Design a protein with these regions (language model features):
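N-terminal presequence-like segments and the immediate start of the first folded domain
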Residues: 1-56, 60-73, 79-128
Length: 128
């Protein structure tokens, strides 16, 4: 089985990694942050705006691999502010169903790659 490395044109160019790796039906998505396609941070200080951009980036990554958000089976969420959890849940509900949610791990951390980032989400999906 071949391995396909994908960097969607709708995502900011990565530096030293791939946004998406597809092996068979399994899709691995690198941690997505609140950066638009031009590399600008979206929603500095605004948790909802950042979570929304992260989910847009996840959607784009999955679309580039032939999938969508319903194909996600695992997420790892890194969050710098505990008080952003309600905003995360609210925005996530717009993008993902709670009928069969993926397994998930939430990690509170002291910081991410850019001090303006409040959240980062990496995912694994199975695309039929």
């Amino acid at each position: 089985m071949s391995v396909e490395y994908i960097n969607p044109s709708t995502s900011a160019p990565p530096r030293g990694y791939s946004h998406v790796v597809k092996h068979g039906n399994t899709v691995y998505i690198a941690g997505q942050v609140a950066r638009d396609r031009d590399g600008k941070t979206v929603g500095v200080g605004d948790a909802k705006a950042q979570v929304d951009q992260v989910f847009k980036n996840l959607e784009a990554a999955l679309a580039a691999a032939g999938g969508n958000l319903s194909h996600i089976v695992k997420t790892n969420i890194f969050m710098t502010h505990r008080e952003d959890l309600a905003a995360y849940r609210e925005v996530r509900a717009k993008y993902m169903s709670n009928d069969n949610p993926p397994v998930s791990t939430l990690i509170l951390c002291s910081g991410l790659a850019d001090p303006d980032f409040r959240i980062e989400i990496e995912a694994i999906a199975i695309v039929p």
